Structures are given as C-alpha cells and as structure tokens.
Amino acid sequence: MAQAGRSGDAFASLDQRRERQEEQAQSGLDKVFYFQGVVELFNRMKIAYGRTPAWTALMKCNAIYLKDFKTAVGVEGTRYGLFFAEEVTKPTWSPDIGANLITLGEKACLDAQNAKYERLQASLKTTSGLVHQVMEKTREAKENLEKANKIQEQLDKVIESNKALHRKIQERNREKMQEYMVRLHNTQKDRDDWVQRCSRLEQENVTLQKRLKEKENALVSVGWDLLGWIVISVLVFGLISLADAQNLTPPAKIVITPGQAEFMDLAKLEKIQVRKYRLDSCELPPEKGCVLYKDYLTTRPVSFLELMAKCSKPDWVSESSYNETTLMEECIQIFGAEWCEGKLVDLVPRKCGEQHVLVNIIEQIEKTREVVTLIYGKVMSYRLDMWITSIFSLVLAGNKEKLFKMAPFIFVAWFLNIPVFLTCVAVNIFPVVSLPFILFQIFMPQFVLVNAFLLWLTLTLTAFYWSEGPKILMEISYALVYTIGFVLWSLGLAVGVTLKLTMVHQILMFCVVAAAICGTKFACTTITVQHPDGTTAKYTRVGKLKNNVVNQCKKVVTTLQTRGVIPATPAKTASIVIVEGKNGTGVGFRFMNYILTAEHVVQGSDIATLKNGSVSVKSKVIKTIPIFESVDNVAVLKLPPELNSVKPIKLAKKVQSDYLTLTAYDPNFQHAATFTGWCIIDGNWLNNSFDTKFGNSGAPYCDHDGRLVGIHLGTQGVLSQGIVIVDALKNTFQLADQCRPQNFDMDEFLEKVIAGTKVSHAAILKELEELREEVQFLKKKCVTYDDYWLCQTIFGQAKGKTKKTVRGRKHLVTKRALGKGHFMKMRMLTDEEYQNMIEKGFSAEEIREAVNALREQAWLNYCIDNDVDDEGEEDWYDDMVETDRVNQEIDEAIERAMEDRGEFYQKKSRLTFVEQAMMHLIQVSKERSQTAKLEVQKENEAQLVKMFERCVTDENTPEGTTSIAALSTEDDVRLVEGKVIDFTKAKNIPVDGEIRREIIPGTKCTEISTGPENKKNILKKKDTHIAEGKVETKSSQQPVDVKDDKPVALEQRKPRACKWCGSSQKHDYRECRFQREKRFCVYCAAMHSMFEGHIRPIECTSCKKSFSGIEKLEDHVVSGECQKN
C-alpha cells in the first residue's frame, strides 16, 4: 500500500508538472503571429464559402484556427465550434465539437487569442465612460468659448458705439465752436459800429455846442441893445407916468405839473413862484438825488448833512430814517430859511410807492397768526384743556402700580412748579433703579452731567450682577440707552420750565412727536418679498415713490433730448429691390416671405419684374392690403426663390414721432440711397422733409433699430408723404394661436419635468461616482512608475493626449475644426469600387489622383458646411507626418512597457524593419523553418552589425529554400536575400551593465538581457521542422504535434466597433450617437434616445388621434384639423 501510495504521489507530481508546462506554453501565445500561407488559405476559403451561413457563424467567433481548406475551428467564450466542408457548396457549422479535433498547442493558441479579445472588450467598456466625459467637457469648453466670443463681440460693439459717440461729440463741439466764433465776430462788428456811431454823435455834440455859444453871444448883444432903448424910453416918457398909477393886482398863478417841473431849474421855478413836488417813481435819478421808499424795519434817522452827502449821488432813503420836519429845522439852523426853502425836495426828488416783497410776506404771516389765534380762542372756548387733563388722569388711573409709583413724583412736580407730564414720562420709561436719580435731577437740575454719569455706572453694575448669560450684554446696552435718554429728558425738562409750558401743551407735543416718529418709521420700513423661484427682493415705500418720480423725470428728459440727437440707424440696403410695373418703377422690400410695395407702382399689372443686383425675375401680385385714410394701398408680391438672399425687415415695436430712415435708390436706379431725419407721425400719416425723387415710391421707413414703420407714397410740395403700415400688416399676417390640450395641468407637468430631471441627474451622478471609484482602483494597482504611466496612457487619456507630446500639447487647446490632414488620410473607395477601377484598366497613378481629388472636394465641402477658413492649411502634410511620428513613438513606448509586464497589447499594424531598429533572420525550406529576431540598444549597434555579418554567409541557398536577412540601425539598413544563414551564431548581446538575464521557454525561445534604467536586449528564436502530418518545434519544451501541414494563421486586427450600436460595419458614428444617446425629452418627461422612441403615446388629447411624430401632432393642433378643439 505504501508503494502504491508513493506511486500515486509520483503520478500526481507528473500531473502538476504537466499543468505547469501547459501554463508556460500558453504564456505569451497572444503575442505570436503566424505568417506562412494563412493569407492565401483565408482568401481561398472566403471566395468559396463567403456567402454561406456556416462561414458567417465562423466569422462571428472571437478566435479562429484554419486547419485546411475544408476545416476550421472557432472559439466564442468557452465553446469550440467546427467548420467543415465536405463539399464546397455545403459547408456545415457545429458550435460545440471543435475541441475534439485540435491539439493541446492549438487549443492554447485559441485560448490566448480569445483571452486577448475579451481583455480588449473589457478595456473598451472601461474607457467608454471616460471618453464620454471627455466629450462632454469638450462640448462645455466649446460653449464657454462661444459665450466668450459673443461677449467679445458685444464689447467690440460697445467700443464702436463709444467711438461713434466720441466722433459725434467732436462734431458737435466743432459746430458749437463755429457758432460761437460767428457770434463773437458779429458782436465785435456791432461793437465797432457803436464806437463809430458814438464818435459821430460826439462830433455832432461839439458842433451843436459851438452853434449854441454863437447864439448866446448874439443874444447878449441884442440884450444890450434892448437895454439901451429901454433907458432912453424911460428918460423920455418918465415924466408922463403918474405916481399913483401903480398896479397892485397880484400875479396870476401858473400851474406846473411835476413832469414839467422835472425839466425846469430852481431859478426859473422861483421866478414863476411854483411849489416843487416829488415825482412818484422807483427809478434812481440820472445824476444826483435820492429815492424815498417804504421799509419794513425801523432804522436810525439821518441828519441833514448826512442826507446831503448821501444824495450827492443817486441813492435810496427809507421812510423810517427820513423825518422832514427835523431835517428842515436842522437846515434852517445851519443855512437859513431862505436857502433851505425847497431844498429837501431837491435832495429827495422821487418817492417809491411800491411795497417790498418781505413786507407782503410779513403781512401774510401776521394774517395767519391772527387766524390761528382766532381758531385757538374758539377751541379754548370749548375747554379742551380740561378734557385733555381728564383723559390723562384716567389713563394714569388705569394702571394702579404705575400710579402709585408716579404719585410722589407728581406731588413733587406740582410743589416745585415743574412740568408734571414730563416727570410722568420719565417715571414710566426709566427702570426703578433710576427713580432716585430722577428725583435728584428734579431738585438739582444743574448737576445733570454728574447725575447722568452716576446713573450709567449704577445701571451697568446692576446689569452685570443682576443678570445672567447673554442677557448681561443686552442690559449693558440698555444702560447706555437709558443714560442718553436721561440727558435728553433733563434738557427737555429745563426747556419746559423756561417756556412755562402747560400740561396740555406738553401732552399735545408728546402725542404729535410720537405719531410723527412712528409714521416716519413705518414709511421707511423695508418689505421683503420672496418669489416662487426662491429669490428675495427688498422694497421700501419711500424708495418706491422716489423711483417712480425719478423714472418720470427721466422720461421727460429723454423726450426733450430725443429731438436733438440723431441716432445711428442700421443700413437696410440689403432688404430692398427694384419693382417694375406697366405704369412705372418703384422700390419694394422683403417682409416675411413676401415683397411689399406701393399699389400705384404695380397698378394695372398682374406680374411685376423684381431686380436685385444682377438678378431679374418675374413675380405675381398676390393681393393688396387697404390702408385706413389712404387712397393708396400696399401691394403684396410673392418672393421668388432667386431672391431668398434678400434680408427681411421686422415690424417696429413702438410707433411714434422720431428720427426715421428711408431706404431707396438714386434716380438712375444704380445705387442705394438713404434719407435720415425727423419724421412726424400724425395718425396713420408720416410727414418729413426728405428730398425724394420719382421712383422712390414703395420704399420702407425704418426706426433706429432697423424695424419697419411705414411705406413711402410720394411727395406733396416740399414735404414727403408716407403711411404707417404696422397695424395693417399685423392684422393681415396674423400668427395662428396654438391651442392647449384640454384638462392640461401646467403645474403638474412642471412637477413631472423637475422630478424627472432630478432622477436623471441623480443617476448620472451615481454612474460618475462609480467610474471614479474604478479609476481610483486602477491607480492603486500601479506599483512602479512604468505601470502608472501605462495606465494613464490606456485608461486615463486618449492615446497621444499626454502633455509630454506634440499631440498632447494640441489637446490642451480645444480643437474647433478638423484639419486638412484628416481628410487627406481618409479612405474614399470601398474594396469593390477599387477592384472595379482596376478591372477597367485604371493605373495606380490615376486611382491615386482620383482619390486625392475626392479628398480635396470633401475638405472643401467641410469648410463650407462648418464655416471653416482654410487659410493656413498649406502645411497640412508636415503636420500629418509629425503627428504620425509622435503617435508611433507613443505606440512603441506602450508596447515596450506591456511586454515588460507580460501583458497583451494589440498593435495597430506591423512595424517595418527600419522602424524596429533590429536584426531579423528568416530561412524557410520544405522541411524546416527558422527565424531569429534580435533587438538591441543604441550602444550595442556595432556588435549587432558584426553578428549580422557572421550569420549571413556568402553561400547561395539551395533550390526550394528561401532566406531573408534584414538589418536596421540608426546609420545603416541592409537587406540580403538568397544566402545561407547560420542561426547557431545568432546569440543575444548582453546589455552594458547587465543586471539580470532571463530565458523564457516556449514554442519561441526568448532571451532577455536587462540593464540599468530598464534597458533590454531581446532575442527571439524559433526552429520548426515540417514533416508530413507533424510539425516539430525546437525549444526548451517538448515538440507539439500538429495534424495539418498548413501554417498557423496570422493574428488579425479586430475591426473598429461602434460604442453606441456595437456594429463593426462602417457608418456615420455621429449620426449613430445622435440616434442612440439618451437625452431628456420634455414631451415624455423622461430620458430616452431617438432610436428607442417616445415613451408617452403621441396622440391628440382631444380627439385621441395617434401620430407618428411630434411634428405631425403640432401641425394637427396648429392647423385646426382637430374638430373637438
């Protein structure tokens, strides 16, 4: 039994050894590629079985092994299927019996390929979510960039408007300066005219004085002559006169008016014995004299000498300071009665009878005071003081505690004759602790500051020791308030004692002040309004009134300023066309999808000619729109497709008299012309002073926003006539109102939308959190720096998007459009099209030119559709080459890192010998196949060249044997064919400073020499003996039997699969994403894709009619087809 047990243990160890060998045999199989004969076998089988169901089922497998022309094995999951074709036309597929027909080595290769495919799928699923996040971030970056561009455009517009305003201000300033210069010139001219006129008048005055002097001399001579004749007459006839013939009759009185006396001197007035009078005038005399006026204040009386000094020049004298009797007595005492007679009238010749404005005001105040006194007397006749005192007494008696507290103070106030009411107010307001201080203040009012300080100290200490917790701070603050109030009360008490205010006056003043304070506080309070969206707004009653007043003032100022400044108006030359009818030519403009013009332009014509630039088309007159109070109408023409480039004009929102712009053509209809000015709107009529010509009829009037106001009809005299058509167009082109479904609850609908948004948002956040956890888990698995970099390359970023590369730096900036290099690498022909061109005899150069022409056309179409500027795309080829080079370096780095880890990495394509920088030896005969591949570091290139020369001999290969030897270094590339290769001399070269050496056995023997900084030299050798029905591979492992002499199939690259639909067929991935990506649907209030369709049935809620799309449902509702609506 012991021996049996030992033998059993021995067999168990053999089984374990066999399992370890199988595992070692499978390690690295996913990197193995089999070249010989597989492509030809695959093409033959595809041509023979390509359209059969069995071949289709075989192609769906994850890994495929082609044994011969009739037999193949496919692996999908854990199932091994068998493809067998006993006849070419009848192949069969068995999904579960393939494992019985393959060897252990073949099964290991299939398992490795299947595992590689599953790992690739897992990697794609892991990265799909991260790629989606990157795309979303890119979209948000695009939106932010567009917003920034819009803000920049708005800033540019503001800058342009500021520049235009600055130019207008400068122009206005120049105009004002020119106007002021003209006025200054006119003023100087008038001044010179006046100077000349004054000089002429002075000359005339001198001439007149000379003439007057001459006349005076003549009069003096005549007077002397007359005096001589009088003396002679007295001597001759003197004796004849009688002594008693004296004439005692008094002279007759001569009445002289004050106006006449003003122009007569004193001597003449005394000669004719006329009494002087003062003139009733408030104007100062021209040379000297005072004006007597009434004053409202009493002033000091003036003396006669002061009056003479004051009235030596024009001045004013008040009636209160002027006492004519006293002044006359002073004058007689000084100068005598004869000299003083009439002197006061000479000094004060004028008297002002008007009253001063302040006198009128004082009289009004006196009248008001009399009325108030009268009313107060009437009120006091009803004995209201008794009623007020009684009410105050009842109020005090209503609270017995306060009454007992106030009683001593009321008695003291009555005894000391101080205001009782103010004392009661103090006792009621201040705390009990302050009552002794109030009593002390009543007796000793002069110690108010000391008393207030002691009160503050007492209240503060009381608050600190008698209160607890947060109440201490509140009580201390109250102590300060009570102290300030105590000082104010003391001052009020002193004022009341001084003015001797009665109790009634005290009560009335207290009630009025309290009501005013409370009312003002209520008017200034702030009202907080909370809106349904959660925002709050604060308003004040006074602020609201103030804002209303300010807004009204702004409106008035804006109205006053509107007429003075001509605003900038958008040009509407791109919206007008020339309209030619039978009876004349005019102007038309586009409104919506119609051309409008005046009716008299196309009168008598059913079809008119429309011209815009070089385009001339015919259009039919659809209808006319009548205008109220106008003999002319508006003609409506159909918009031809050729004039779709004409821009439409929108209706004005507000119609009022303003600066408007008329857009028309010159008389020759060659260029557009605009007229801008003030237009007066009177009802429907529009009047202006534009210099319009014949042919401007039908032109549009637009406001400063470029919106349509009216249409031009013609010229009446010097005024242009237009008509306002805003209301007429609104009534004619009414929009159809959309009906709301019956029993539709908007609030419930909004609640569903909000709830759905919250649910979808929560799901997105949950999925995002799960993805973050997975990424963090992958990061933790990275042990070394190479592992971390590798994970970052595969899972963290898209390939080539690292910041250390050129493509990574390009990735930092959001790419707004594709480059030309993308299109110049695009595949334009399918395999069938390419094959057809070859069959038709096209050469390779002709096919290449045709493909390049298609690529150029695709690039131009892309630029036109996406508004991309192709300027600067001349260097697209250099950029494409540089990008490919950088991507190739990244691929090589990833491959090396993954080979070091012993993990799978799917290559994009096979690398050439030059790109690999290595030595590759291949020799194949009918009996044997040998390969050797050696990759070394740069410092071992010289040793690699010597080894290549030793391995490649000068002997030619025998018939039936093929050999290829390739060497690729930085400075040398060699390719030798048809020479015998000595594989025994192909050995691995140790790397400088070798740390360790590894040998990985298997079907291909791999030797790795590792040095510092993870530098490696790798040698891979394989020797396969081909016999009939058996393939022997020399390595450190046992030979593996193969039942077929066909070479192993090459590892095929998996086609790209769409992450939205899973199909590997070429199609529009963007459209596929648009159809299958889930979005929030407002109609269904849920998340779904367009491919899934709407969750909520699309039907009319009124008539229950179903529709295939929401657009048809909207048409059904808007067009009024629903009979129940």
From Swiss-Prot:
Mod. after translation: Cleaved by the viral and host proteases. The protease is probably autocatalytically cleaved.
GO CC list: host cell membrane; membrane
Sites marked Cleavage: Q170, E171, Q552, C553, Q797, A798, Q916, A917
Coiled coil regions in record: 131-218
Transmembrane segments: 220-240, 379-398, 407-427, 437-457, 479-499, 507-527
Record-linked Pfam families: Astro_VPg, Trypsin_2
Disulfide cross-links: none
Position of the signal peptide: none
Reaction catalysed by this enzyme: RNA(n) + a ribonucleoside 5'-triphosphate = RNA(n+1) + diphosphate
GO terms under biological process: proteolysis; viral translational frameshifting
E.C. numbers: 3.4.21.-
Protein name: Non-structural polyprotein 1A
Organism, scientific name: Turkey astrovirus 2 (TAstV-2)
